[in-house]
Amino acid sequence: MIKVAWAKYEPDNKDNVESCITLNGDGELADRPCEVTRPYICYRPESLKIEVTECGTIDPEYHLDKRTNKCYKLHTVPRNFSRAYLACSAEGGHLAIINNDVEATVLRELFAKYPDAKFLGNYRKDLAFIGFHDWGEKWDWRTVHGQTLLEAGYTSFAAGEPNNWTPGESCGGIFRTGLLIDVWCDKPAAFFCE
C-alpha cells in the first residue's frame, strides 16, 4: 500500500465534476476531472508474480499461432479505428496485417472462438478492425506500415467491397469469414492486434 495524503482543501469535487484522483508534485492527492489526459503511474504489489508468455508479453490474451509464427489478440471491447490503433501500440503490437491466406484463416478461426455474446456493447459483431485504411487517395488501401494490400500479400475483399458506402468507409476490417471490408473509422468495432 502506498501511503499518501490529500492536498490542502482536497478532495473538493469542484463543480461536481472531479471524479478522478491525481498525484501532485508534492506527492499529495487531489481530485480532478477525468476528461483531461494526464501522465499516470502503475502500481503492482511486489508479491504479484508476473509471467511472460511465449508472445513476449504479460498479456495472456495474446496467442502464438505456429502456422504464422505470430501472436494475435482479439479485443472484444469496441474502439474506433484510431483508439484500436493506439491500444495495439500500447501493448507493443499493431493492428493485425494479413499477409496471406493462411493468416486470414488464423484470424477467421480466432474470431470463431468468440460468439456474439462475448462482445460488449451495441455494435456490429460480424467484423473487426485490422491494420489497413484508405490513405486519403480513394481506393488506395494501405497497411498501417504503408504497404499496399497487394504488397502485404492479401487482397481478398468480400463481394461488393470495398464500396465506400455513404462516403466515409475509409478504414479496414475483416468479416468473420476472413474476407476484407471497408468500414467507418469512427464507429466502434472489435479489433485484432498482432
Where do the PLM segments sit?
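Disulfide-stabilized extracellular beta-strand modules
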Residues: 15-26, 38-40, 69, 138-140, ...
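Short, structured beta-strand segments at or near domain termini in extracellular proteins/domains
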Residues: 33-50, 183-194
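Acidic glycine-/aspartate-rich tracts in secreted/extracellular proteins
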Residues: 11, 25-26, 45-49, 101-103, ...
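Conserved hydrophobic ligand-interaction patch in extracellular adhesion modules
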Residues: 79-132
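Surface-exposed ligand-recognition segments of extracellular binding domains, strongest
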Residues: 1-16, 119-168
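Extracellular disulfide-stabilized recognition modules
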Residues: 43-93
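Terminal peptide-recognition signature
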Residues: 6, 21, 42, 88, ...
